[in-house]
């Protein structure tokens, strides 16, 4: 069988310490999973069921990249997150077995065009243009859980131009990784290659052209992204 157009390139993430890569199938993001962040966004951080939104698989971009400032926004925000890479699929996964489905972990950014997201919220429309744009998901190489275990506590932070903007601890997650996996698997079949970004701590805020972003999760890794100086050309069709 042949395709009528060239097949899209398979998005993938490096696996730390190897020449292998992890193919990305889908990207799920958990909304408001740290109490302080929920409050700063104007919500009550109780244990309501988590909610999810998606980014396209090809939104992933490797740590270390210099990126063009995204189009159509004047309010680009950073959100540092623990990235969970699914290595074994399943549906209705029990909480007690959920971590068996994890291949490994990374550090990622849920970059957000906050002005477009807010416009969509005000109009009661979907968030895709605010969340699901090109290169909106920088990610570090993944570390297999077989080597680092399953991080449930430890510092998670983000700096902009050397100044700490976000600071939290993984133990502040309202929904732990295993709970998120179990709940999401009730609605969709999880498959190898799925990523889950498990929420961001307080301190989300704007970044501009020329800014350097540095993120960290204890025991998982360090992420660095730079936005090109103002005037850098975006690739045209």
Where do the PLM segments sit?
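Extended, compositionally biased flexible segments
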Residues: 1-102
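Catalytic-pocket segment enriched in acidic/His residues
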Residues: 2-22, 33, 37-45, 106, ...
């Amino acid at each position: 069988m042949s395709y009528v157009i060239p097949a899209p390139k398979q998005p993938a993430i490096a696996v730390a310490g190897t020449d292998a890569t992890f193919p990305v199938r889908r990207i799920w993001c958990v909304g408001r999973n740290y109490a302080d962040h929920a409050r700063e966004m104007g919500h009550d951080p109780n244990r309501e069921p988590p909610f999810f939104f998606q980014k396209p698989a090809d939104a992933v971009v490797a740590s270390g990249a210099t990126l063009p400032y995204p189009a159509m926004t004047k309010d680009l925000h950073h959100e540092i997150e623990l990235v969970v890479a699914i290595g074994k699929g399943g549906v209705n996964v029990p909480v007690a077995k959920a971590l068996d489905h994890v291949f490994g972990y990374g550090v990622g950014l849920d970059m957000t065009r906050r002005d477009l997201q807010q416009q969509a919220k005000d109009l009661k429309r979907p968030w895709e243009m605010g969340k699901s744009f090109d290169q909106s998901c920088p990610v570090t190489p993944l570390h297999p859980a077989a080597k680092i275990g399953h991080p449930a506590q430890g510092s998670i932070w983000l700096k902009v131009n050397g100044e700490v903007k976000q600071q939290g601890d993984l133990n502040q997650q309202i929904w732990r990784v295993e709970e998120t996996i179990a709940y999401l698997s009730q609605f969709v079949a999880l498959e190898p290659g799925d990523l889950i970004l498990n929420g961001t701590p307080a301190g989300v805020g704007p970044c501009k052209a020329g800014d350097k972003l540095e993120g960290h999760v204890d025991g998982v890794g360090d992420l660095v992204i730079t936005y090109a100086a103002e005037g850098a050309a975006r690739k045209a069709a």
